[in-house]
Amino acid sequence: MASREHLLLDPAALAVSWADPAAVEIPPELLAALGEYLSARRSDGEAEADAEAEADDEFMMYEFKVRRCARARSHDWTACPYAHPGEAARRRDPRRVAYTGEPCPDFRRRPGAACPRGSTCPFAHGTFELWLHPSRYRTRPCRAGVACRRRVCFFAHTAGELRAGSKEDSPLSLSPKSTLASLWESPPVSPVEGRRWVDGIDECDADAEMEELMFAMRELGLRKVRPSASSVTPVLPPVTDEDGPDFGWVSELVM
């Protein structure tokens, strides 16, 4: 039997006569090779299309984890920008449901419990609804700037990416200039579903923030490390870093 590489490079090795196409019986080796080729090409094309879509603000605010995924075969939800049944990262469409970019108080007071208002709740449910809301998405500069390596980042990496947000939806009525000043907010460092939310970083809450950070690391299966005040190079990032570690959205994607 010819090797797969030989089949791909030399169709003549199949010993098939193409004089009468109707009489040709395609060998299973060719069908298998063709299937693998088409599958790889389709996957590459879908990945490129997803990457292009995620670079668009409109897509991120109104389609990311909102539009139902149309793929029939099994795939990695964490690498797919579309919504799947039972996925914790799913969002309500802000164009169809009138909710604001403010966190739902029931999600904060009742960890793990469903909001009694359900899908009609006027507040954001979860990290993705909160930070991808048009009143918040990219209205804050990312601390890492162009060096950011997050696959999904809710913040602006250049001045050109900064958005003013919608005045009717935003409680802060931000302008692009004001976002570069002292107004800093960041996503919660803890997993949103099942844990309390942390909306800002405050030095007086350092102990509580460190506890949340340690929990987030345990949720991701990372090794628990106790910070040492005498350590020259801390293992964990300081809790006063407003942009926070990239744990919350990851845990939500894989739930």
UniProtKB/Swiss-Prot annotation:
The keyword Manganese does not apply. It holds the Pfam family zf-CCCH. GO terms for molecular function: DNA binding; zinc ion binding. The keyword DNA repair does not apply. Transmembrane segments: none annotated. A zinc finger (C3H1-type) spans 98-128, 137-159. InterPro entries: Unkempt-like, Znf_CCCH. Keywords: DNA-binding, Metal-binding, Repeat, Zinc, Zinc-finger. Signal peptide: none annotated. This is Zinc finger CCCH domain-containing protein 37. It comes from Oryza sativa subsp. japonica.
